[in-house]
């Protein structure tokens, strides 16, 4: 897990991701991490691995990468102490919001493509959030408009 102690980043041997959703964007994340593994490791300084994938259709995941473990219960991701970051790419408000809350309460960092999260949830609905919890917003349109990696 990435930790900051007085401005110094400490990285684990690898960063483990729990991926929620395997549609167009989620499938793209699987392919980018698989196809550019060496470059990502070089730039980040440690490997980034998808440890588990939450998917309604396991066959989609296995078509992209047969080695990825597929789960159907969010608790298998939020309860896994080895998962550092939960990447939410479900594509609909529900159950994405509930899953993100569970992940944050379990001490995971969350990356989501739901830019309008605050509008969906209302002003006070994230009052349970602690100062140590992190939500990062990813505008997935950017990924399609510009290359992530130069060859």
For each predicted feature, which ranges?
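Short glycine-rich or small-residue beta-strand-to-loop segments that form or flank ligand, phosphate
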Residues: 18-21, 111-112, 137
């Amino acid at each position: 897990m990435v930790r900051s102690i007085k401005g110094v980043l400490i990285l684990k041997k690898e960063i483990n991701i729990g991926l929620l959703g395997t549609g167009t964007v989620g499938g793209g994340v699987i392919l980018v991490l698989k196809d550019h593994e060496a470059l990502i490791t070089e730039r980040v300084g440690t490997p980034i691995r998808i440890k588990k994938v939450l998917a309604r259709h396991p066959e989609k995941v296995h078509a992209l990468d047969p080695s990825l473990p597929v789960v159907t219960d969010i608790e298998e991701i939020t309860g896994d102490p080895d998962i550092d970051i939960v990447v939410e790419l479900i594509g609909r408000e529900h159950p994405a919001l509930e899953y993100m809350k569970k992940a944050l309460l379990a001490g995971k960092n969350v990356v989501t493509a739901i830019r309008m999260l605050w509008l969906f949830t209302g002003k006070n609905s994230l009052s349970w959030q602690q100062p140590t919890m992190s939500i990062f917003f990813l505008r997935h349109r950017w990924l399609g408009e510009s290359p992530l990696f130069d060859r």
